[in-house]
Design a protein with these regions (language model features):
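N-terminal pre-catalytic "stem/leader" segment of glycosyltransferase-like enzymes
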Residues: 1-73, 116
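Conserved catalytic-core segment of nucleotide-activated headgroup transferases in glycan assembly
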Residues: 18, 133-199
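Active-site regions of enzymes building and remodeling cell-envelope glycoconjugates
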Residues: 35-38, 48-53, 71-74, 103, ...
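Short loop/helix-cap segments at secondary-structure boundaries that form the rim of catalytic
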Residues: 43-47, 64-67, 116-120, 137-141, ...
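Short, polar loop motifs at secondary-structure junctions
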Residues: 57-60, 110-114, 175-184
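Short acidic active-site motifs
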Residues: 63, 95, 200-202
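Catalytic core of nucleotide-activated saccharide and alditol-phosphate transferases
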Residues: 67-161
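Acidic donor-binding loop of glycosyltransferase active sites
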Residues: 206-215
Length: 215
């Protein structure tokens, strides 16, 4: 494909080191492809054959034509479950949808996601699976009996479904504290919440549990 750049609201027009502590999927792909993470508005001076855009979770009103100033082709990369944009206010749902159609193609995580985006009318949908950079991660070294659920009680993470299944196991239940955690979750008596962590700390912590459930 040639020269690739990623674009997100957290981009600073620089590349990440391989030991970056918060290497979530989009950052991991930057590292694997030796590509910079660029800002959505403050464009870099260099030009790219392909720009891969991560639409901000809370502010989807991005301008693809602005990014095309420095990219020959534009792809939108799936962020979260494929239907998450339906939690936006109505105008933003249509804005997000229009951006999907305006992109040269869409990168999704799984074949099931591909079918969804094709059903929306996207002209070219390709699978770009979640990626993890393993360097520096701690192998499992504690064998506890607790069950970890994979997210909080919002549609993005499906925490309620995971919680109901975890209760059937009869073991202690632990949950992460994500950015969308609701305050009332602390009132659930049989869940112990971990503090908010960067990606590397979360993965190292996750590896210590007996069972993980994410539905």
């Amino acid at each position: 494909m040639g020269k690739i750049g990623f674009f997100s609201e957290t981009g600073n027009n620089q590349k990440y080191p391989r030991d970056f502590p918060n290497a979530r999927t989009e950052v991991a792909w930057c590292i694997a492809l030796d590509a910079p993470m660029c800002h959505l508005q403050k464009l870099p001076d260099e030009h790219f054959d392909l720009g891969i855009v991560i639409v901000p979770k809370n502010n989807p009103n991005i301008d693809l034509e602005h990014i095309r100033k420095v990219c020959d082709k534009i792809a939108i990369m799936q962020e979260g479950p494929h239907w998450y944009f339906q939690d936006y206010e109505l105008p933003n749902q249509f804005h997000y949808y229009n951006n999907l159609l305006e992109a040269d193609w869409v990168y999704c995580h799984n074949e099931s996601d591909r079918s969804y985006y094709e059903g929306l009318g996207c002209k070219d949908v390709r699978v770009m699976r979640s990626l993890m950079i393993p360097e520096g991660l701690i192998s499992r070294n504690e064998w506890g009996n607790a069950t970890i659920i994979g997210g909080n009680f919002v549609s993005w993470y499906g925490g309620f479904d995971s919680y109901i299944v975890a209760r059937q196991l009869g073991d202690p239940i632990v949950a992460p504290s994500m950015g969308r955690k609701q305050e009332q979750e602390n009132l659930i008596e049989d869940i112990q919440y971990l503090p908010y962590m960067n990606w590397r700390d979360w993965i190292n912590s996750l590896s210590q549990f007996n069972i993980g459930i994410h539905l």
